Amino acid sequence: MLTKKPVLSPDRCFSPEPVQRRLAHQFFDSISALPLVCPHGHVDPALLANPAARFGSPTELFIIPDHYILRMLYSRGVPLEALGIPTRDAPTETDHRKIWQLFAEHFYLFQGTPSGLWLKDELTNVFGVDEALNSRNAGRIYDYLEGLLALPKFSPRALFKRFNIEVLCTTDAASDNLENQRSLHEEGFTQIRPTFRPDAVVNLDAPGWRENLTKLESSIGREISSYATFVQALEERRAFFKKMGATATDQGAATPYTTSLSDQEAEAIFARALIGKLNPGDVEQFTGHIFMEMARMSVEDGLVMQMHCGVMRNHNPALFERFGSDKGADIPLNIEWTRNLHPLLSSYGNNQRFRLIIFGMDESTYSREMAPLAGHYPTILLGPPWWFHDSVNGMERYFNQVMETAGIYNTAGFNDDTRAFVSIPARHNVWRRVACNWLAGLVTRGLVDEEEGYDMARALAYDLAKSAYKLD
């Protein structure tokens, strides 16, 4: 490109203190070439199933699908329809060059944020852009990116190989036929594995619950008319996912509340859901009971269970009505783990066939609840900092609050948890850098020795994720 201008510091995420910075570089150099293990994320498998697939325009790649970008721009008054997001009640901008220009004019908003760091990394290291994006060079950079995206070497499959991804797990609805994964496996492309995500049918207040139940019925070829047949359907689909290479499930809820209902109680709630006449409290009780059922099934089939809790979805109802979900309007909640998980752990917490990875948005629970739980129960692992805390400072807070009680070997390593495929290397790079800098700090303070630091760096970068998700 034109004027050479470095936009990424080689010392990013590292301490300014010389001894710690030197050690951080040494640790990072020792693990930077390790393959990427991506055990949880939201990449569309269709991108990889079709050898001819391309990403489309720069706007389609970087802006339209990224709710991190949408929420920041919306917070500063940029209408979502101006960013190409379809709405139910107004025209939507279709000129992708115009959308990119608007994005570039507001690129300064991402200064100091994880999104800004990822975007700079993607533009620099994936696409070779050697100047900072701004309103003046937006058109030129758009043309440059558009040209690259048309080339075979920038296809999703080519970048998958270039990124050195060892395994990538998608997140798929319980009713998904997994045809994309099947076609990939038939080609010998077995690095792509599904993950069983039943939220759309087990959370009775999920948008479109009845329609999603119909899809589940279609996937098993029969009617679901009772709670008993519903549970049978979930068990069958889990078996299908496992046959297709899945090693894990994932379930999200506002809180990690768990409870055991009798068959009669569960049947009564499900019957009310079928006719659309739920009572107050039914949703929480049923979700809490299904967490217990998912744990039981995990003991039986060996799939790792993941729980993502602590977010209020669609906090902005007006935005949801116009644009739908996943547009940046989800907000963290304060939650409680110790009492909520007690029924589940009383039943399964000591069962060596059970493995539970927990993710939370309430950082106040890291040292008070999450780390002590993982530091005691042999079945629990802590997931990495999630969503709003997937950042340099968020990772540092996580390490400092979790590791004293749980150690690193009761954690699940890192997962990128992203829809943005080209951001995967950048996200892993930040995690590895922050981890190495934190470890270097431990060494300089005499808390671990240098040899232990190298071992821990490898574990955090690679080994822990493979082991946690049974990808060995």
Swiss-Prot record:
Q: In which pathway does it act?
A: Carbohydrate metabolism; pentose and glucuronate interconversion
A Pfam family for this UniProt protein?
UxaC
Please name the InterPro entries in this protein's record.
Answer: Metal_Hydrolase, Uronate_isomerase
Record-listed E.C. numbers: 5.3.1.12
Name the Gene3D superfamilies for this protein: Metal-dependent hydrolases (3.20.20.140), uronate isomerase, domain 2, chain A (1.10.2020.10)
Q: What UniProt keywords are attached to this protein's entry?
A: Isomerase
Recall the GO molecular function terms of this protein's record.
glucuronate isomerase activity
- Provide the reaction this enzyme catalyses: D-glucuronate = D-fructuronate; aldehydo-D-galacturonate = keto-D-tagaturonate
Gene Ontology biological process terms from the UniProt entry: D-galacturonate catabolic process; D-glucuronate catabolic process
Q: Matching PANTHER family, A to Z?
A: URONATE ISOMERASE
Similarity comment text for this entry: Belongs to the metallo-dependent hydrolases superfamily. Uronate isomerase family.
Q: Known NCBIfam families for this protein?
A: PRK02925.1
Q: What is the protein name for this chain?
A: Uronate isomerase
